[in-house]
């Protein structure tokens, strides 16, 4: 399986979880790509950050825009893609399963309850 992970607003929200997930995926022979809209000039810093978090990956790609991640998913033949923004999942292609996860999760800590689908849809 080929997995794509957004960095900012997704992977950096729970690097411990994604370190565990990527290690398990790669040890199972799966391909992991990190897709980010960071400046390509920050590649060394970004790679150091991922290494510091223990995130295992095969490739890192720097998108030219948020919507460019769709093209990258198609070119890399990504099967499953995790992101947090609508603009990033446009154009991924029908063969890619998208897990779009809102920043901060789906629990309203102020109200101390899970968000309903209707409320979550309005927020998104």
Language-model features and meaning:
Residues 1-66:
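Alpha-helical substrate-recognition element adjacent to the catalytic core
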